[in-house]
């Protein structure tokens, strides 16, 4: 096992990465190794997808499957080894079908890629795990060095984050051939074990630029189906009655669940990154969407154990449900998996609803505590002139984009302390689950404009980028000249690709934490600092002083 893709990876003087029987996330060495094998199979599939496009062949089954299967290897998504192997077998079957299509056009069609003809050696998981050793990401570290390995992983993990957003967009009916062609090209190239530093750096920026387009079609999918988010108050306390909790990012799953629970007497609560769903008109119209439950994903083993109903996981993040003994009432959807947990293959939630009706639910309603979400792209752009006016009248000094992933590391209290230290004449724009560090606190307003503005899920960084570009255009300056600072927390690969997106768009002087990614060497961090001004957090006092004086 070698896995260094998330923030909680093991760090030692001898090197970084989880390499024992089990990773810090709970992923076993078997599952981790089989995910490496799956990625190799997907690289071979992409190599043939690139070749097929040369012949004008576009296989939509391949395009829809490849990013989805890659998404299953993202942190805290799928811990079920047999399902990972199932994805690998499906990748190979699709590859062979695509290869046959190419050979039908050109009998001499071939692909020069080491993954292009990969076959699984056995049905036995142990044998497959031994085969997977051939594809361990750091297998040639001694030959290429830590810097090249780090850049390869930056590209691989960044592309994995983009694949997750591609799947979210695909579920909502969004498709862009140029994006899929670019994805396959990059995925196939990474399967050749590239070792050119400049080419890898360029690839990382290409991934960032591609992901901006992905976020654009995802935004179009969400707003096209569910309307543009508008500011909405959400209760974060319990309401009496039967209940279901839904977590993850998939708004379509939430919509289907709301439709199927309507009139059943079962209330629905969002959790984690599903909180922004309350801002969408077509979702909040369901009166039994009664609130949001819990805090950051890392607290789920305690909070889920206390929730008196079933739980549905639509995407990341899931962690071991046996710890809180709720594994008999947690359900997985789509690419999510945990051994022994029931999986929903389709859109029918009737079994979950039946379980909810059989459980006690909340016995009484707690005193409501309301927070505000729903500052989507249209709302943000509608406030652009107000922001400019406040800045011109020196009522608004600075905007801090304070967001990203949450996690268990104690140093993450930095983000709570930073938020509460932001001066009263400054505004906090937040997104993603890092907001749970401070989103239940009171921040007041500036002439009626809330000082805490929740822009949505992690992919809604797109809205923040569009706002920044709009403000810069109206003020006749560059984005980096705005009174705007980005302080980002990271945990997994979606955060990595968001960072690459920002860097590829030329955004500079981003501050990140709580630690630097374990796969980035001091040399690589120095390069990113020199090119983009990217740096790690220090202390709240020092960072606040530096950012306000910039």
UniProtKB/Swiss-Prot annotation:
Keywords, alphabetical: 2Fe-2S, Cytoplasm, Iron, Iron-sulfur, Metal-binding, Oxidoreductase
SUPFAM superfamilies: Prismane protein-like
UniProt pH dependence: Optimum pH is 9.0.
The record's free-text note on cofactor binding: Binds 1 [2Fe-2S] cluster.
Keyword Acetylation set for record: no
Positions of modified residues (Cysteine persulfide): 405
Official protein name in the record: Hydroxylamine reductase
Originating organism: Escherichia coli (strain K12)
């Amino acid at each position: 096992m070698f896995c260094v893709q998330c923030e909680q990876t093991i760090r030692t003087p001898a090197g970084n990465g989880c390499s024992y029987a089990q990773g810090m996330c709970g992923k076993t060495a078997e599952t981790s190794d089989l995910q490496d094998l799956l990625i190799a199979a997907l690289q071979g599939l992409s190599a043939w997808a690139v070749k097929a496009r040369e012949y004008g062949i576009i296989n939509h089954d391949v395009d829809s499957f490849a990013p989805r299967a890659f998404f299953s290897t993202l942190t805290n998504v799928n811990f079920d080894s047999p399902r990972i192997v199932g994805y690998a077998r499906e990748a190979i079957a699709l590859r062979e079908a695509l290869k046959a299509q190419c050979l039908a056009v050109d009998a001499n069609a071939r692909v020069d890629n080491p993954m292009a003809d990969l076959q699984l050696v056995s049905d036995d998981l142990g044998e497959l795990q031994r085969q997977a050793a051939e594809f361990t990401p750091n297998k040639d570290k001694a030959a290429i060095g830590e810097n090249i390995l780090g850049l390869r992983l930056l590209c691989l993990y960044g592309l994995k984050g983009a694949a997750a957003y591609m799947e979210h967009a695909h579920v909502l009916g969004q498709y862009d051939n140029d994006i899929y062609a670019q994805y396959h090209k990059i995925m196939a190239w990474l399967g050749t074990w590239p070792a050119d530093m400049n080419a890898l750096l360029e690839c990382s920026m290409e991934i960032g630029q591609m992901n901006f387009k992905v976020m654009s079609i995802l935004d179009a999918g969400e707003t096209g189906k569910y309307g543009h988010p508008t500011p909405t108050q959400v209760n974060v306390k319990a309401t009496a009655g039967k209940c279901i909790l839904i977590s993850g990012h998939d708004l379509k799953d939430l919509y289907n669940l709301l439709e199927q629970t309507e009139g059943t007497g079962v209330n629905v609560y969002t959790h984690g990154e599903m909180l922004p769903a309350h801002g969408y008109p077509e979702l909040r119209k369901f009166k039994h969407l009664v609130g949001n439950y819990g805090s950051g994903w890392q607290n789920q083993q305690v909070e889920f154990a206390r929730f008196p109903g079933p739980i549905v996981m639509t995407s990341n993040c899931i962690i071991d449900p046996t710890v809180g003994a709720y594994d008999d009432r947690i359900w997985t959807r789509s690419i999510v998996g945990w051994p022994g947990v029931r999986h929903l293959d389709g859109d029918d939630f009737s079994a979950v609803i039946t379980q909810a009706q059989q459980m006690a639910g909340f016995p009484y309603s707690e005193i409501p505590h309301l927070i505000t979400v729903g500052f989507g792209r249209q709302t943000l752009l509608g406030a652009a002139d107000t922001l400019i006016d406040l800045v011109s009248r020196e009522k608004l000094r600075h905007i801090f984009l304070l967001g990203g992933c949450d996690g268990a590391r104690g140093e993450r209290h930095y983000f709570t302390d930073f938020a509460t230290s932001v001066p009263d004449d400054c505004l906090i724009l937040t997104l993603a689950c890092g907001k749970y560090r401070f989103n239940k606190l009171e921040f007041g307003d500036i002439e009626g404009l809330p000082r805490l503005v929740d822009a949505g899920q992690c992919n809604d960084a797109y809205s923040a980028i569009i706002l920044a570009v709009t403000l810069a255009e109206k003020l006749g300056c560059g984005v980096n000249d705005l009174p705007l600072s980005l302080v980002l927390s990271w945990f997994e690969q979606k955060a990595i690709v968001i960072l690459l997106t920002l860097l590829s768009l030329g955004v500079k002087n981003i501050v990140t934490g709580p630690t630097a990614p374990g796969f980035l060497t001091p040399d690589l961090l120095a390069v990113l600092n020199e090119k983009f001004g990217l740096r790690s957090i220090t202390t709240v006092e020092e960072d606040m002083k530096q950012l306000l004086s910039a």
